[in-house]
Design a protein with these regions (language model features):
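Short, intrinsically disordered, charge-balanced linker/junction segments flanking boundaries
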Residues: 278-283
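Acidic, Ala/Val/Gly-enriched low-complexity intrinsically disordered segments
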Residues: 9-10
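Iron-sulfur cluster-binding cysteine motifs and their immediate structural context
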Residues: 30, 204-227, 233-234, 244-274
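Immediate flanking context of iron-sulfur cluster ligation sites
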Residues: 191-200, 242-251
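A short, flexible beta-alpha/helix-coil linker loop
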Residues: 190, 231-232
């Protein structure tokens, strides 16, 4: 009985701490936060093995599939993962028009403003400090994009959104326009439920992808994706040069056409946009 009562008390304390973490997260500019276990991502492991076998990988992500799918290889004491999302703007006020004689380039919206790794890192550091104040002996490891875990798989399991046919996590509040990050923690929080939603019969993103890079079930052939092609240093095949058009970095087509993104344009004070820089004149 004493063990049972101890577990009940511990659960109540962790639920109280969870609510405090959520409230604090919102106060520092984190738009969405969710909790999941530190269990392996077995379904993702199978998908990644198929992905690599088909030659779809970009080469930018961690190549060790075990590291990508087994959180405790990164932090052995991990009991939970806290996933966060920060929305970014997708509309540019006062943007110069691209017209004949004054052609303008385009950057993917995720690259607008300050480097998003810095934006996310500051928030994760503040959140980690807050948790350490409450639980001094907690062990934490934070990750943003360049970490070994799949940000999208963590976010989906933590209930931040569902994976759309364009491969992005689609949130009811943020659409696909969000930066994702996570932290492994040695505290056993109650996990949140994944979001039960889907794209239904909609295939607009698949149909409108300029290079046919979306291959179904949320999978992407990175070798054909313009976002990857504008970042690779390898030889660019002629068939893709025309399709890239005036894109200088990245591609947002599969997000721009997504019906789930209608009416969404999240703003934050530390994401400052400069139209002349974001739509530069092409020589």
């Amino acid at each position: 009985n004493s063990i049972c009562n101890f577990k009940k008390v511990a659960k109540l304390m962790n639920n109280k701490l969870k609510k405090e973490i959520i409230d604090f997260a919102h106060s520092i500019g984190i738009d969405s936060i969710g909790f999941t276990t530190a269990d392996p991502f077995d379904e993702l492991k199978q998908k990644l093995e198929e992905y690599h076998a088909k030659g779809y990988a970009s080469g930018f992500e961690e190549s060790n599939i075990s590291l990508r799918t087994e959180p405790k290889l990164s932090l052995p004491s991990a009991r939970s993962i806290i996933a966060i999302a920060v929305g970014y703007p997708n509309k540019l006020k006062g943007a110069p028009k691209s017209v004949k004689g004054d052609r303008r380039g385009m950057f993917a919206r995720a690259s607008w403003g300050q480097d998003y790794h810095s934006i996310m890192r500051k928030r994760l550091d503040k959140l980690a400090d807050f948790i350490k104040e409450k639980v001094p002996d907690v062990e934490i490891q934070s990750m943003v994009d360049t970490g070994v875990l799949s940000d999208r798989a963590v976010a989906e399991r933590a209930g931040l959104g569902f994976t759309g046919r364009n491969g992005f996590v689609i949130s009811p509040e943020l659409g696909t326009w969000s930066y994702l990050g996570e932290m492994l923690v040695s505290i056993p929080f109650e996990p949140d439920d994944p979001l039960l939603d889907s794209c239904g019969d909609c295939t607009i993103c698949v149909d409108r992808c300029p290079t046919g890079a979306l291959v179904g079930n949320g999978q992407l052939n990175s070798q054909k994706c313009i976002s990857f092609l504008t970042q690779t240093k390898g030889y660019l095949q002629d068939e893709y040069r025309y399709k890239i058009g005036n894109r200088l970095y990245g591609c947002d087509t599969c997000q721009q056409v997504c019906p789930k993104n209608r009416g969404i344009n999240t703003q934050h004070d530390d994401i400052v946009l400069e139209p002349e820089i974001l739509k530069p004149r092409l020589v």
